Amino acid sequence: KIDFVLHSIGMSPNVRKKRTYDDLDYDMLNKTLDISAVSFHKMIQSAKKLDAINEYGSIVALSYVAAQRTFYGYNDMADAKALLESIARSFGYIYGREHHVRINTISQSPTMTTAGSGVKGMDKLFDFANRMSPLGNASADECADYCIVMFSDLTRKVTMQNLFHDGGFSSVGMSLRAMATYEKGLDEYKDANGNIIYG
């Protein structure tokens, strides 16, 4: 048996073909959902039927805040991530009750991945999120560290959760650092050396 499984795949043909959300190709949408979310259900269902995961084992999938908030350009991937998180809750109850297996999703900062590079304006979103987050964007390596924590026995009673790993981005409405990008009248928030005092 195994102790943990990571689901980390996502792809949208609509995004790749630059189809807007109000002009989706539905065959492509089905592919988006199948690859990015339904595959998570298939993976868990197969593991359960094979009794492949040890008691208190851990299943983790990578999500994004666009599952719960509107992000222009994220397109049908937002729908896929919302489904992904729902699967974690629904299957998390069944697998937890019957085999004490944990299922969670991690909502990661914008990360410059192959899949992410297909999202229009990803570089600007990456910069904006970094300015908004008090701790800055979480890197891919830091996400891997967090996954290891979620695989470990230290989180044996954490299940059916969507856990934000985004430097605080999801809890910030507007940061001074982001405002300073657009508002040039914030000089009073600079120290004697001209550095912006982030609050």
Question: What does each model-found stretch correspond to?
Answer:
Residues 17-21, 118-122, 176-182:
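Short, flexible, mixed-charge acidic loops at enzyme active sites
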Residues 38, 105, 123-158, 163-167, ...:
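C-terminal helical subdomain
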Residues 1, 14, 27, 176-199:
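Non-catalytic terminal and boundary segments that flank Rossmann-like NAD(P)-dependent oxidoreductase
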